[in-house]
Structure formats: C-alpha cells, structure tokens
Amino acid sequence: MENKLVIGTANFGMNYGQGMDSKRLSEQTTKEILQFARRLGIKTLDTAISYGDCSKRLGFIGIEDWKVITKIPKIPNGINDVNDWVKHSISQSAQEIGVSMFEAILIHNPGDFVGEHGKELLWSLKDLKKKRVTKKIGVSIYEKKDLETILNIFQPEIVQCPVNIVDKRLLKNEYLHEISNMGIEVHIRSIFLQGLLTYDTENIPVEFTRFKDFWQNWKSWLSSQKLTPVEACVRFVNSIQGIDKIVIGVNSTLHLQEIFHYFSKPPIKEEPRWGSDLETELIDPRLWNQNKT
C-alpha cells in the first residue's frame, strides 16, 4: 500500500508557518528532505503557484519520479480571459518544475468557483484534465461551507482540508467519512496547525498568548498522556477514517524521521477535551495576521 504521507513544499520557496522553523529552507536542506522522503516510500509532493520560487527550486533539484499536486492561486483582479490565465499559469509551473503531467490541480481559493469567473474556471480545469495536463482536479477548502457550495456546482475528485487535534470542525458527524464515501479523495493538511502546536508552551508568540487557557490545558494534557506535541498531533490523525493523503511540512530530515516514526504508532487513547469550542481566531490561520497585537 502506498504511503499516505505527502511532503508539503511551502517552506521550500518562502517563509511559512510559526516560529524559528518557519524560515525558507536552504536548497541543500530541501534536497536532503526529498532524498530521505523517497527512501521512506513517500512519492507525492504538494505545492502551489503562490509558494514563492518553489517551482523553480524543485525543477533545479529534479523531481521527475515524484507525483506533484499543485494549486492555482486566487484569480487576480483585472483578469478577463480566465482560461488563458489558467493555462499560462499551469504551463509555466509545469515547465519550471519539469513535469509533463500533474497528479492533481487544485483551486486554492474555493470562492472563485462561485465568483463571476466560476463557470470559466471549472471549464478550464476540465479542459486541462481532458488534455492530460493533470490526472485529477479538486479544491483546497478551509471549512465545511466551502465544499457544500462547490458540491452544488460539481464534484471534485480531491478535497484538501485542514484537520488537527484542535481543529475538528470537519470531523463532526463523520463529515470527512461522508465525503470519502462519495468517491472523493480526502487530503488533510495543517496537522500541526502550521507548526503552532509544536511550540514550547513557555515561548508562545505574543499574538497567541491571549489563549492562555488553551495553552495551559494543552500542556497539562500532554503531560498526563506522556506525549510530545508532535507525537500527539500525528497519532491523532492516525485515528481518522476516510483519509487518503496527509500533507506534512518538515524542516529537516530529522524532523521528517520523527514524524514518520510516530505514524507507525497506534492512535492516541484519549483525546484532549477543551471544555468548549475553541475560538476560530486560534484555529484558522487566515485570521492570525488580523489579530496581531
């Protein structure tokens, strides 16, 4: 059975995530991670046109034997011919990366499907698949309502969404399992909440210190279960049914080795209880920059 892990490449091309480990990786580190991932049986990369110079870096390193999932960014203002823009964007990315066919092309901004260019965007995606530029088409979502809106328009082959031990919104009422039963591939991302959950609780970034009750509960629960933050996050997603791929961001081969090791462990026995729903400002990274003090 093929490895479920997918290497996220955002930090290959730009600063990404939280903390000291959020810096853009060096070319040498990037190369080492890819070589090590290949030895572990990981065969898929997740990238995006908006990830800085990631496409060029991947092309320079050479990833001909990898499956590559990419994402089309939000349609810029002033674009009149969406089909031409999509084709040009994907063609340029494929040329930079050095692939003849993508494993999948996802829409990064689900709202584009219901915008003024929605029909043209969908036609462009289907045309790319028809012309064998990609094997599959899909969408990257943030919350349940994104997908519910899209399902009124078409059924994507892949849905990528955030899921982690504190953000379980898409797990309510076995929603992901329901999606999987529809024949849609489910890919999850942000299993460490972009690195935030791996922080030493004594060194939380200032903009997150206002969630002190959460950090106290998180620290106490980890201690009671004798778990590290990384182990807890990984073993939590091990318990979720209906997941096809798990996108992880790593900053070194040692980091990847640690994560891979915990994926061989059984699911955690007892999940943390927060007492009430966690604030959206904590679990939704789109809101982080809006709430800096």
What is the predicted role of each segment?
Residues M1-K67:
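N-terminal binding-site loop/beta-alpha segment at the start of enzyme catalytic domains
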Residues M14-Q28, I72-D84, V114:
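Active-site mouth loops of central-metabolism enzymes
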Residues S22-F36, D81-I97, Y142-T149, C233:
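Short, acidic/polar
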Residues D46-K56, I75-N83, D112-E116, I165-L171:
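Acidic-and-aromatic substrate-binding clefts and catalytic sites of carbohydrate-active enzymes
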Residues K56-K71, W123-K131:
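Alpha-helix-loop-beta-strand connector modules within alpha/beta enzyme cores
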Residues L58-K67, A94-S100, I150-F154, H177-N181:
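Acidic (Asp/Glu)-rich catalytic clusters
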Residues A94-F113:
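Active-site groove signature of glycoside hydrolases
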Residues P110-N291:
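Beta/alpha (TIM)-barrel catalytic core signal, keyed to glycine-rich beta->alpha loops juxtaposed to Asp/Glu
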